[in-house]
Amino acid sequence: MNSGILQVFQRELICPICMNYFIDPVTIDCGHSFCRPCFYLNWQDMAVLAQCSKCKKTTRQRNLKTNICLKNMASIARKASLRQFLSSEEQICGTHRETKEMFCEVDKSLLCLLCSNSQEHRNHRHCPTEWAAEERREELLRKMQSLWRKMCENHRNLNMATNRIRCWKDYVSLRIEAIRAEYHKMVAFFHEEEQRHLERLQKEGEDIFQQLNESKARMEHSRELLRGMYEDLRQMCHKAVVELFQSFGDILQRYESLLLQVSEPVNPEFSAGPIIGLMDRLKGFRVYLTLQHARASSHIFLHGDLRSMKVGCDPQHDPNITDKSECFLQWGADFFISGKFYWEFNMGHSWNWAFGVCNNYWKEKRQNDMIDGEVGLFLLGCVKEDTHCSLFTTSPLVMQYVPRPTDTVGLFLDCEGRTVSFVDVDRSSLIYTIPNCSFSPPLWPIICCSHF
């Protein structure tokens, strides 16, 4: 091949960021290609759209696929470059004057074929140098993919911690006021119990606030460690073959050690402090509901994403839903227009449920649809996330940092007061009171639950 054409061909296999042959190349929607690690490291803020470093256009692509054709051609070019390096005078075997085409796994050295069969190396494991180099680069890429997922997870956790810290003091203040309001509704005034409860709540809030700040600092440190290791792995992929072989084991040990140091987020949770007399007061408004028995044919289920809540389920896209899963959404047979009412529902062993009331128009217009948003819904929801569960209320959507109810949840509806209160019956504690509800009577009890 003409040397000029060869140079042009080789130039097309060079990443414009690192100026080395592509490793795991990706092509973004503007048409330019980069090493995946280079593109990721150049993407400074994961919360915003990535920008092409060549044409400066933004790209909406996030799940980038490897350009297999470009990857194979870059591998061929790298192997050709390696063969040229191995045929240099410095790399020729001094004993046999042969090219060092074999790699010894035991002493991490390059050998010619005759040396690899010598008495010294005969019992060692050997493999072709070209294959060993590419195999190690592939292993480094696999580690980088795993590391990138960790970096994304840490980024999400850091954002979540930042949001919690920003809202925490307001959340604590609202919770204190809600607990104080419950004590003041009692016929008998439990002043000392109220003071102890509120003081404990204030102290817990301060302790958790400190834990959140400490956790954020640890995650910020983890972010720098993860990024540094990702950069080191990327650079190792481009090292000369001798250094790649000699340093490979050390960098993998550093990688494994780093994973043990990555900080996990704090899941803040107040203790479930009982309120004396709460259940006695609420049971004075007790009603017993009858649920409509038509189970939704679409296996309606609850998804809780605190950025875009959905009520409903799609068996095709939820790996937790199987043929044996029981998913349903039902309304009460009776509705409420005015007055005060209290009822309970036993959630059993379900970790995925929503329970509350809804405005009439929500029921009439959307009862057979997947529901996006929360207009007209006044719910307490529980969503399982790995081994942890999150509680939240709607209207507006608010995380609730209290223990998950173990069994029975109670709801107190005050139509004139425009409030919906949720209580943990077994612990005799208040979960949350939704204030200033935009009721549009009649109001219907609603329950959405799944059992796996």
Swiss-Prot record:
List positions binding Zn(2+).
93, 96, 115, 121
Quick one: a GO biological-process term for this protein?
A: innate immune response
Q: Has UniProt tagged this entry with the keyword Zinc?
A: yes
> Residues in domain B30.2/SPRY?
269-452
Where is it found, in Gene Ontology cellular component terms? cytoplasm
Give disulfide pairs as residue numbers.
Answer: none
Tell me, what's a Pfam family for it?
Answer: zf-C3HC4_4
SMART domains registered for this protein in UniProt: BBOX, RING
Give the record's keywords alphabetically: Metal-binding, Zinc, Zinc-finger
- B box-type zinc finger span: 88-129
Q: Which GO terms describe its molecular function?
A: ubiquitin protein ligase activity; zinc ion binding
Task: Give the protein family.
Answer: Belongs to the TRIM/RBCC family.
Mind telling me what this protein is named? Tripartite motif-containing protein 51G
Which species?
Homo sapiens
Top-level taxonomy: Eukaryota, Metazoa, Chordata, Craniata, Vertebrata
Which gene codes for it? TRIM51G
